[in-house]
Swiss-Prot record:
This is Acetate kinase. NCBIfam families: ackA. Belongs to the acetokinase family. PANTHER family: ACETATE KINASE (PTHR21060), ACETATE KINASE-RELATED (PTHR21060:SF15). Its EC number is 2.7.2.1. InterPro entries: Ac/propionate_kinase (IPR004372), Aliphatic_acid_kin_short-chain (IPR000890), Aliphatic_acid_kinase_CS (IPR023865), ATPase_NBD (IPR043129). HAMAP family: Acetate_kinase. SUPFAM superfamilies: Actin-like ATPase domain.
Amino acid sequence: MIVLVVNSGSSSIKYQLLDMDNEKVLCKGLAERIGIPGSRIVHKKDGEKFVIEHPMANHDEALQLVLQTLKDEKMGAIKDFKEIDAVGHRVVHGGEKFSGSVLIDDEVINAIEEFSYLAPLHNPPNLMGIKAIMKLLPGVPNVAVFDTAFHAKMPKKAYLYAIPYEYYEKYKIRRYGFHGTSHRYVSRRTAEILGLDYNKSKIITVHLGNGASIAAVMNGKSVDTSMGFTPLEGLVMGTRSGDLDPSIVTFLIEKEGLSPEEVYTILNKKSGVLGLTSNFSSDMRDIEDKALENDPLCRLVLDIYEYRIAKYIGAYVAAMNGVDAISFTAGVGENSPITREEICENYLSYLGIKIDKEKNNVKGEERIISTPDSKVKVLIVPTNEELMIARDTKEIIEKGIKKLEY
């Protein structure tokens, strides 16, 4: 089965074409700067990179060009669009309605539109991609895989905020969590690597990219996660503040004469690592480099970053009453030996964790980095959200079902 995976953003579209008989990536790419000057597709096949400079006024035009690229004699991997058996779409927010991946129909499209108020920057462009593909590939089934779905069945004690209950009833204000597809892939893969029964395991997944979140996965289910109503809650991130006292918002509005929208922008785009370093960088690689050169501010920022992560890990050990394994993933999680080592050695030794420094001193390679006698196993597991989306798509189509429950 050939599955096309589409991740449609506001001005870019990531795509992968996979042969799901062997889970091989046939080709992949990124259509970027959609609707603005300088639009292009960066396409990769068999390790070779192609750059296609071409105007793309909207998502329809971008995906039309992507499809043409997929069947191009030199760059493509198919000869006819009929070879594409199904399309899997990343959708950021599924609200409370979707706790698993679903076959897309009019009802699903309406629901994604309905939840756009919860993810105004993400759901509308996700929908543009879905509608464009349905127009360009009529008759090909489409599947939606939601970032929030893995966390949708968290217990109420984990997802409700201690605010008047009527706001949950009226507006569905609750903790939703994000990066669900990544947490699901990494936790499953962790169990496979260690030979654990996924449905009888306690795994903490640590997704550290520019956006970052942690999940407690108990017996194959997400029971808690650090992001909340929006992706702003939780860890210190590249440009996001993570947890903070809500009264800071009203304080800044009053003292700085800012609008609520301006404060929201500050907390989302100008805070986190970027804000703490006075706009030096939002990239943890830059912070680490400076910290290793004994820059006091960057050393402090690295400490704050690691401390917040360690606190959440400790909280989730308590939430699950134990832990079998901790897995690091995404840009920082996969590629920062110093962050992994310092979190584990400075804060988690009470769990009986011991890190093998030689095994830890790698980047982006799947492996166990704890010692054989470590009471809790620690791993690097590179995430693969596209493969997870393709697997869900294949399962729904092959089984002829409308919904896949996790």
